[in-house]
């Protein structure tokens, strides 16, 4: 879900059978995310799990934890076709962000008894990257490029320069934004393109 049309989208998703929601934004440390979480909590209580993000430091994690997020996504600008760092000038190395947020999660658990899982989102290109992210403290992973290569991904298989490829685009790209998947909130005229369209080598 995003933090713009949640009042319409969330009830429709719940009615369709969803029991876990995730707010998708490149900037999770924002009042818009808190408002979205508050809406879900006021309407559905704890019967629906809601994750939030993305953040890259302890302050961002604590903000979302205290706002009531059930899990937190970590990573800004690390995706293989993400250009948030170039267009907005924000972001952080994925390993550094993950280690700091994992430490904040553990400290929060010691203080409150509430364990909030964290998801490493972005920059996981090769198999060993998964192992590294888990070793650095991630509870689970979010991956796009890795799975976009396969038949099961919904995009078209094409031949480019004699090789099979699959279409792939960033969640912050204009193409994805047309589907209202990736939104910060606020005025629609204040928007940045934060991803690009590309291809990945077909893997079967």
Predicted regions and their residues:
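Short beta-strand/loop segments at the ligand-binding rim of alpha/beta enzyme cores
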Residues: 1, 20, 39-56, 71, ...
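Catalytic alpha/beta active-site cores
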Residues: 1-4, 16
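Active-site-adjacent beta->alpha loops and helix N-cap segments on the catalytic face
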Residues: 3-9, 25-50, 55-65, 79-102, ...
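Catalytic cores of alpha/beta
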Residues: 6-13, 50, 56-74, 124-139
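Catalytic domains of carbohydrate-active enzymes, especially glycoside hydrolases
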Residues: 13-23
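Short hydrophobic alpha-helical runs that function as membrane-insertion/retention elements
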Residues: 21-22, 73, 142-143
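Short secondary-structure boundary segments
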Residues: 25, 76, 145
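Alpha/beta catalytic cores of nucleotide-metabolism and tRNA/nucleoside-modifying enzymes
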Residues: 67, 89-120, 125-204
């Amino acid at each position: 879900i995003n933090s713009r049309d949640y009042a319409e989208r969330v009830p429709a998703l719940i009615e369709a059978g969803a029991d876990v929601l995730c707010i998708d934004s490149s900037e999770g440390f924002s009042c818009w995310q808190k408002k979205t979480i508050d809406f879900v909590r006021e309407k559905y209580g704890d019967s629906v799990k809601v994750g939030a993000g993305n953040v890259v430091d302890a302050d961002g994690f604590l903000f979302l934890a205290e706002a009531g997020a059930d899990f937190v996504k970590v990573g800004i600008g690390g995706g293989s076709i993400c250009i948030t760092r170039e267009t907005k000038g924000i972001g952080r190395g994925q390993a550094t962000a993950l280690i700091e947020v994992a430490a904040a999660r553990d400290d929060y658990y010691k203080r409150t008894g509430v364990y909030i899982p964290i998801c490493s989102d972005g920059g996981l290109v090769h198999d060993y990257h998964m192992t590294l992210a888990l070793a650095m403290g991630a509870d689970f992973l979010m991956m796009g490029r890795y799975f976009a290569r396969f038949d099961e991904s919904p995009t078209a298989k094409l031949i480019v320069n004699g090789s099979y490829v699959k279409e792939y685009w960033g969640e912050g790209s204009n193409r994805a934004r047309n589907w209202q998947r990736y939104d910060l909130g606020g005025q629609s005229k204040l928007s940045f393109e934060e991803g690009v369209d590309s291809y990945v080598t077909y893997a079967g």
